[in-house]
Amino acid sequence: MATLEQNLQQMLQGSVEDLGCELWGIECQRAGRFMTVRLYIDKEGGVTVDDCADVSRQVSAILDVEDPIADKYNLEVSSPGLDRPLFTLEQFQRYVGQEISVHLRIPMLDRRKWQGKLERIEGDMLTLIVDDQEQSFALSNIQKANVIPKF
């Protein structure tokens, strides 16, 4: 069964691309009776405020017609930022060699949070170098991942 994020991704991706942007990812977070639906968009050269506004208007119209969210919600549209979240295998592959953080669904070695250099991806496993040691994680066990920006 597909998640709400997966359903929204499928529903909205084409419209976002028609506006010249990539739908980087979607997060849905519940807070009490309300939900926040957060869309991350990206494009070559960077995302502008006008891009976010255009995507927000387009997506709002689609969600009003399709009505896929049963609860009241707030829609947020933004760029992924420097510490961008990673949602897909392809996105992880773009950042091999860079520092990332991962939050696991099921702890490994009594830890849920890990940070290290993304060394490689093989199949559905990614390997980080953490404190000069290799640690491998199943993509299915990663709840959240972010790029650690270099300054």
Swiss-Prot record:
GO terms for biological process: ribosomal small subunit assembly; translation. Keywords: Cytoplasm, Ribosome biogenesis. It is found in: Cytoplasm. Its main location: cytoplasm. InterPro entries: Ribosome_maturation_RimP, RimP_C, RimP_C_sf, RimP_N, RimP_N_sf. SUPFAM superfamilies: YhbC-like, C-terminal domain, YhbC-like, N-terminal domain. GO terms for cellular component: cytosol. CDD domains: YlxS_C. The keyword Cytoplasm applies. The keyword Zinc does not apply. Belongs to the RimP family. HAMAP family: RimP. PANTHER family: RIBOSOME MATURATION FACTOR RIMP. Required for maturation of 30S ribosomal subunits. This is Ribosome maturation factor RimP. It comes from Mannheimia succiniciproducens (strain KCTC 0769BP / MBEL55E). The lineage of its organism: Bacteria, Pseudomonadati, Pseudomonadota, Gammaproteobacteria, Pasteurellales. The gene is rimP.
